[in-house]
């Protein structure tokens, strides 16, 4: 097995304040996301979405958080993609935000439900026109013989809709992740990291620190 040529010697870094476990987890998420928006050069709303088949075979990919509140976290996708098929069969998912520049991550576990048609329509209409056309042209996760086939399909739907409105495809919508666990992780010197997990029981949240 090839080893990476990286040093295991930890260097001292500017320490962040300890995670406040008395805080509301959503207020803490908002503060960390605000820090990420100021510090991260690329897509601070990027998150890893992990799904699994009913028999436990996992898969993961990067998606973009598009909205959130205390009810949960929303992303949009093709409903015929692998992730959507796995969510339909097993709605338990995990999200992971990693902000390297801040040396922080947030891990969220919860269950998915579909967003409403009104929510999906409103977000779809806000997308760039070429992205809306692409949602019609692409059979996401299906085999593609040649790139020219995708370009041909895009040309066809562009001609079909012209300068008129582009409706949302029936196979395109969003998923709402309703969290039952939110873990905050912060890098500290010598791998003695700061971890805290907030867990939902009913409508109440409780928090505890974890060993790093």
Curated annotation (Swiss-Prot):
Binding residue positions for substrate: 66, 123, 127, 131, 191-193
Pfam family, one: PNPOx_N
GO biological process, one term: pyridoxine biosynthetic process
Keyword Oxidoreductase: yes
Keyword Kinase on entry: no
Molecular function terms from GO: FMN binding; pyridoxamine phosphate oxidase activity
Needed cofactors: FMN
Catalytically driven reaction(s): pyridoxamine 5'-phosphate + O2 + H2O = pyridoxal 5'-phosphate + H2O2 + NH4(+); pyridoxine 5'-phosphate + O2 = pyridoxal 5'-phosphate + H2O2
InterPro entries associated with the record: Pyridox_Oxase, Pyridox_Oxase_CS, Pyridox_Oxase_N, Pyridoxamine_oxidase_dimer_C, Split_barrel_FMN-bd
Annotated cofactor note: Binds 1 FMN per subunit.
Enzyme class of the recorded protein, top EC level: oxidoreductase
Residues that hold FMN according to the record: 61-66, 76-77, 82-83, 105, 140-141, 185, 195
Protein role: Catalyzes the oxidation of either pyridoxine 5'-phosphate (PNP) or pyridoxamine 5'-phosphate (PMP) into pyridoxal 5'-phosphate (PLP).
NCBIfam families for the chain: pdxH (TIGR00558), PRK05679.1 (NF004231)
Assembly description: Homodimer.
Family: Belongs to the pyridoxamine 5'-phosphate oxidase family.
Protein name: Pyridoxine/pyridoxamine 5'-phosphate oxidase
Provenance organism: Acidiphilium cryptum (strain JF-5)
Name of the gene: pdxH
């Amino acid at each position: 097995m090839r080893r990476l040529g990286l040093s295991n010697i930890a260097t001292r870094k500017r320490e962040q304040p300890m995670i406040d476990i008395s805080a509301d987890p959503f207020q803490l998420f908002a503060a960390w996301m605000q820090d990420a928006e100021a510090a991260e050069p690329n897509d601070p709303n990027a998150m890893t979405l992990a799904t699994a088949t009913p028999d436990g075979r996992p898969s993961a990919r990067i998606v973009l958080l598009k909205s959130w509140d205390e009810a949960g976290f929303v992303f949009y996708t093709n409903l015929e993609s692998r992730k959507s098929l796995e969510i339909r069969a097993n709605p338990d998912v995990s999200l992971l935000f990693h902000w390297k520049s801040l040396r922080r991550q947030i891990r969220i576990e919860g269950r998915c439900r579909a967003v409403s048609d009104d929510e999906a329509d409103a977000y779809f209409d806000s997308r760039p026109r070429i992205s809306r056309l692409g949602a019609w042209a692409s059979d996401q996760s299906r085999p593609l013989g040649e790139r020219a086939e995708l370009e041909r399909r895009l040309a066809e739907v562009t001609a079909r809709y012209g300068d008129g409105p582009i409706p949302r495809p029936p196979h395109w919508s969003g998923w709402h992740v309703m969290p039952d666990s939110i873990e905050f992780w912060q890098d500290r010197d010598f791998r003695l990291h700061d971890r805290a997990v907030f867990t939902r029981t009913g409508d109440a949240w409780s928090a505890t620190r974890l060993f790093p």
